[in-house]
Each structure stands twice: as C-alpha cells, then as structure tokens.
Amino acid sequence: MKRQKNMLKKLAAALTVSLLGLVPATAQESGTADAPAAIEIKDFSLGSPDATVEVIEYASFTCPHCASFHAEVYPQLKADYIDTGKIRFTYREVYFDRYGLWAAMIARCGGEMRYFGIVDMIFAQQQEWAASDDPAVVVENLKRIGRTAGMDDATMDACMQDGAKAEAMVAHYQANSTADGLQGTPSFVIGGTLHSNMSYDEMKALIDAELAE
C-alpha cells in the first residue's frame, strides 16, 4: 500500500511539476498548516439519480476521438436519454498526459454547477487550447476557458497549485480504470460492461436493451 501511494505521488508530481512557475503561487503556500484531511474526489453526473440505467464515460480531455464523441454523439444522447431522465450519465476523467490533468483541474475548479459546461467548452476548443508545445500557453488557454465560465485568475491559480488534489484525482482515476479494465478512450460502461468507442445507434441499442430489462 505504501509503495502504491508513493507511485501515485510520483505520477501526480510528474503531471503537475510543469505548472511550477506557470501560475502564481497562492498565499496559502507560504505558511505552515496541519496535515490536510484526505481529499475525496467525486464523479459528476447528469440525468435522473433514480434512473435504472447508468452510462459511465471514460474520456481524456486531450483525446481527439473523445472530442469527436462529444461533438457528434453526446448531444443526441443527452437530448434523448439524459435530459429525459431515462439514464444517469457519469463522466470520469482520464489522465494520459499533463495537459489532460490540467484541463480537468480547471473543469473541477468551477464546482459541480459549472463542471459540464466547462467540459463542453474544453472539448469544443480542444484543437485550439491544446495545440501549443509551450505549457505556459496551454495554461493560459485553459484559464481563458475558465474566465468564460465566470472564474477569476486567483481562483484558477489556487486550483492549479493544489498538488494534494491532483494526487487524489490521479488515485481516483487509477482505481476506477483498473476496476473497470480500461484500455483506451473514449470507453463506456453500460450495464456494468465496458465498451469501446461507438456510434450513436450502437449506444442506443445497448441502452435500450438495458432499459427493457
């Protein structure tokens, strides 16, 4: 267990270390404080909490196929099944690289009420915000999305500097992806079974079969 925790710390550090110097340090960092309590990372969901069928999406914010799913399939899925209360849709972030983790930190920074709106903007603007090889440019691009969502720079800088939360996010991702046998993105858990990327018609057939049971 101790070895696993050390590995998680190293992975989170590797993904966040490049943020040092890219966002201003917060005042909280200069003082001493008691050890923080364990950080619980929750999954965000849309749709009825009473729905009998849950669809879980695993996606990376830097994955082109994930962006395509959100542009081409997700709107119809949302209109037909999520907004109507037929299913509960849960989004789980996947961190293959530092940019994907940083995007998730910005999305979560807005809280539950803003989360999915920020997710939509991150995917819609993926080719723009993630195109640069300069990490500072990527951070500024993500903060621009955050500003559009109503966040100020001080709030976002504090979120981006939260290494303990980044570590907890990575641990949450690894635990879920291992439990579900994740192989790539986007992937979907429907009725407890993991599926790879698919068309709307393919997803509709799987969901309808679950609803009919």
Question: What does each model-identified segment do?
Answer:
Residues 2-12, 28, 60, 144-213:
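C-terminal cap of thioredoxin/glutaredoxin-like
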Residues 2-97, 170-174, 212-213:
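Extracytoplasmic thiol/disulfide redox context detector
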Residues 42, 102, 156:
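Glycine-rich, flexible loop/turn motifs
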Residues 49, 82-84, 114, 180-183:
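Extracellular/periplasmic catalytic domains that process cell-envelope and extracellular macromolecules
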Residues 56-58, 120-123, 151-154:
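A short alpha-helix capping/helix-coil boundary motif
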Residues 61, 67-147:
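Structural alpha/beta surface segment adjacent to cysteine/selenocysteine redox centers
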